[in-house]
Amino acid sequence: MPYILPRSFCDTKQNVNIISQASDLKPGSRKVCVAIGMFDGVHLGHQQVIRQTIEDARQHEGIAVAITFDRHPNSVVAPDRNPPLIYSLSQKLRVIESLGIDTTLLIHFDKEFSQIPGEEFIQGLARDCGAIHSLCVGSAFSFGHKRSGNVVLLKRLGQELHFIVHGLASVSLDGRTVSSTRIRESIGAGNLDVASQMLGRTYALAGTVIRGDQFGRQLGFPTANLDPHDLVIPPNGVYAAHAQVQGRFHRAVVNIGTRPTLQNPKPKLQVEAHLLDVSPDLYGQEMEIAFVEKLREEQKFSSTDALQQQIQRDIEAARRLF
């Protein structure tokens, strides 16, 4: 899959309409069309659910609402099975909005929320949102305390509360189901093209730029150090990449790894981006990195001089790709 800067990576809009409780929606006389899901990665299957909701809203002059969560439910109910996320929360919200959703209801998923039975959750949603016209989910969607709710329950509640339920079948690509789990596996294995195909856009890693130990600057190659909190990370190595930060795009060389040349007794996985030709102050900013090509594996060098020389070769190799 050729590298493309897709709309979702290029979209720098920050005017996402987000509410934290259903009673804040205030649709007036408009019908409410709802999509519900974790939507990690907002992949092709998620997009199908969201677009069905948008279509319903447009056909009935309603409002399209996405309901999602601020963390993975497993982080609360099953921490030992909590997966790393594909997207940061801000990434996810931006991509959902870019699809055409009018409002996103972002639910804080905590212990108290996890105890709400599925039926009670939907009844409360219908009460607080006003006139729900339709509710769209994936066919395998489950919800409520101990995952007690499913599409069958939704359809029963839809009959009682007078809303339409869409339980959409999963999307397949090359004969296999598109899922967040498969995308995480692809990213972790370095199959970023496969992940991008399932996402429907070029995969990008996001995180906040944090203060590092200035080692790159000492070598003459200052880096923006990323804190990709709780996210799945591509394999260790050196990559040519594009970085988006503060609404601007920069060519970059990115190192993912533990910097073995430094012989740190407590090595820590780091994501470091050297932006070519610029060295802005980016601390505290969110950066997105879209990987163009892996240049080499991470390796241990005999000296910092040897490391400097290799970094210069990496930069030259990256420039030839842009």
Q: For each predicted feature, which ranges?
A:
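A structural preference for short, hydrophobic beta-strand core positions in alpha/beta folds
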Residues: 66, 106, 165-168
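Glycine-rich, Lys/Arg-enriched anion-binding loops that position phosphate/diphosphate groups
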Residues: 158-257
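N-terminal catalytic cores of NTP/NDP-binding nucleotidyl/phosphoryl-transfer enzymes
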Residues: 26-88
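Phosphate/ribose-recognition catalytic cores of enzymes acting on nucleotide-derived substrates
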Residues: 212-322
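N-terminal Rossmann-like or analogous alpha/beta NTP/dinucleotide-binding catalytic cores
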Residues: 75-161
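Residue-level signal for inorganic ion chemistry
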Residues: 43, 96, 135, 195, ...
